[in-house]
């Protein structure tokens, strides 16, 4: 039988507080690494810079993340987990799943650091020796596949305009969103990413 911490006892309370502090520090490291990777890219950021931003020593950072690669992958996994929860909440399908993306794009417009992170790293990761290369290959494959399923479901429900092929539509939508993010990061003042995605989907969906 497993043991649990008794917070009413001194040792249990000490361990509980210690674990909580460790989790909080780990979260702070992930947040600061996200910002720095977004500003300078993976190759342009050092662990010492991240440690300094967090107010801890280099060995202190290595206690939580022994390598720069492990930190990068933890940052990416954390962001994916958060965003995936938003996308799949309520288990939408078909046209509803596609329209859910408008809200995600609107949210991204309030998270410049996250958009910078993925834009910079996805460009860097085109190099086969980049530690996030496989991650981004898998991520794009998964996103395109999920969108293709959503378009196919919309077609089966009679919600997709004639002549639209799900596989192509999925890739076009990913390309549109990525392109909009780059233009937005470059400072286009007239660009409303969410509105552009919404208009694109309206041109494809019947309901």
Walk through the language-model features, giving the residues of each:
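C-terminal peripheral helix-coil segments that are non-catalytic and often amphipathic
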Residues: 2-16, 95-112, 141-157, 176, ...
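Hydrophobic alpha-helical connector segments
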Residues: 74, 85-115, 166-173
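Amphipathic alpha-helical segments used for helix-helix packing
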Residues: 110-133
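Hydrophobic alpha-helical segments that form the core
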Residues: 117-119, 164-183, 196-203
């Amino acid at each position: 039988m497993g043991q649990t911490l008794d917070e009413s006892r001194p040792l249990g309370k000490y361990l509980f507080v210690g674990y909580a502090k460790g989790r909080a520090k780990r979260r702070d490291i992930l947040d600061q690494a996200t910002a720095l990777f977004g500003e300078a890219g993976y190759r342009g950021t050092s662990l010492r810079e991240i440690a300094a931003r967090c107010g801890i020593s280099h060995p202190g950072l290595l206690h939580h993340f022994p390598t720069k690669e492990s930190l990068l992958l933890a940052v990416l996994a954390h962001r994916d987990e958060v965003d995936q929860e938003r996308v799949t909440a309520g288990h939408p399908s078909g046209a509803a799943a596609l329209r859910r993306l408008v809200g995600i794009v609107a949210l991204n417009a309030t998270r410049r650091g996250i958009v910078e992170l993925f834009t910079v790293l996805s460009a860097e990761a085109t190099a086969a020796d980049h530690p996030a290369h496989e991650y981004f290959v898998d991520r794009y494959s998964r996103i395109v596949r999920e969108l293709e399923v959503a378009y196919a479901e919309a077609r089966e429900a009679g919600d997709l305009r004639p002549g639209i092929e799900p596989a192509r539509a999925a890739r076009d939508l990913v390309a549109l969103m990525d392109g909009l993010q780059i233009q937005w990061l470059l400072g286009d003042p007239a660009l409303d990413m969410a509105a552009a995605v919404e208009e694109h989907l309206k041109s494809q969906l019947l309901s």
